[in-house]
Design a protein with these regions (language model features):
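Extracytoplasmic/periplasmic, Sec-exported soluble proteins
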Residues: 26, 52-60, 96-97, 101, ...
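A structural "domain/chain start" motif
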Residues: 1-75, 81-85, 143, 151-156, ...
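Acidic, serine/threonine- and glycine-rich low-complexity intrinsically disordered segments
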Residues: 150, 159, 164-165, 187, ...
C-alpha cells in the first residue's frame, strides 16, 4: 500500500475573456494592493488569527499576492507589513513610503473545515481526510471607493491511506491539507481577478506642470515607453 497522497480537487477555472487572451505584449501595469484577507470562520480561532504568522488569513493573502505578481501584469504594493518597511526607511533617514494603489483587494475566508471518513472491509481499512474552503474577494476602485467586482471561490483537497491485513500506512492528522485547500480556493479566483483588473483603463496622476511639460506618475516599470500618448 502506498503512502498517503494529497489530491487537490481543482474547481472549474473561470473563463478568460478574448480581451485578455489577445492582449498585446505592450501592456501598462496596474498598481494593486491587498488591503486585508481575514479568517471569518470559527475554524482555528485563537491560533489561526491575524497576529499569527501561520494564520490562514495571512496565508491566503500571501498566496494571492504571489499569484498576481507572477502574472507580471501588476505592480503589487505591500500593505500588511508596511510598518516594517517604514521602520527600515527611518533607519536610513528616509521618509515613509507613500504610494497609492489604483485598486484595492479585500478578501475573507468565509468557510473552512475538515472531515474524516473511512471504510472497513473484511481484510482492509481506509481513511480519507478532506478539507474544504471558500474565499470571497472584492475589488475596490481607490479613486471612487466603488466596488467594481466581487466573487466567491472554493476549493477541496483530500488524502487517503489504507491497510490490508494489517499492512500499509496509518494516516494521522494531515495538516498539509489546510495549505493545499487554501491554495486551490485562491487559484479558482486568480484568472477572474486578472481579467477584471486588466479590462479597466489605465490612469495616472499629474505630478506637476512646468511650462508646457506635464509630468505624470508612471514609468518604464509599468510598461510606459517613449513616444506613448495618453488622453487627458
Amino acid at each position: 500500500i502506498s503512502k498517503p497522497t494529497i489530491i487537490p480537487v481543482e474547481p472549474n477555472k473561470p473563463v478568460v475573456s478574448k480581451t485578455i487572451e489577445s492582449q498585446p505584449k505592450h501592456f501598462i501595469k496596474r498598481t494593486v494592493a491587498i488591503g486585508r484577507f481575514t479568517n471569518e470562520t470559527n475554524y482555528g480561532k485563537g491560533f489561526f488569527d491575524k497576529s499569527s504568522e501561520q494564520g490562514i488569513g495571512r496565508q491566503a493573502m500571501d498566496i494571492l499576492s504571489a499569484r498576481l505578481a507572477a502574472s507580471e501584469k501588476f505592480i503589487m504594493l505591500e500593505r500588511e507589513d508596511m510598518d516594517l518597511i517604514n521602520s527600515e526607511l527611518e533607519m536610513n533617514n528616509l521618509g515613509n513610503l507613500n504610494i497609492a494603489a489604483d485598486y484595492l483587494i479585500l478578501g475573507s475566508i468565509s468557510e473552512f473545515g475538515r472531515k474524516t471518513t473511512g471504510e472497513v472491509g473484511v481484510f482492509s481499512r481506509t481513511k480519507k481526510q478532506t478539507a474544504f474552503a471558500k474565499v470571497n474577494i472584492r475589488l475596490v476602485d481607490v479613486a471612487t471607493g466603488q466596488v467594481i467586482y466581487s466573487e466567491e471561490g472554493s476549493g477541496e483537497a483530500f488524502s487517503e491511506a489504507g491497510t490490508v491485513l494489517g499492512a500499509g500506512s496509518q494516516a494521522g492528522y494531515d495538516s498539509s491539507l489546510n495549505d493545499k485547500v487554501i491554495s486551490v480556493a485562491i487559484s479558482s479566483l486568480v484568472n477572474s481577478i486578472i481579467e477584471n483588473l486588466t479590462e479597466k483603463p489605465w490612469r495616472s496622476y499629474i505630478l506637476s506642470i512646468e511650462d508646457e511639460v506635464i509630468i505624470i506618475a508612471g514609468g518604464k516599470t509599468q510598461g510606459i515607453n517613449v513616444g506613448d500618448s495618453f488622453n487627458i
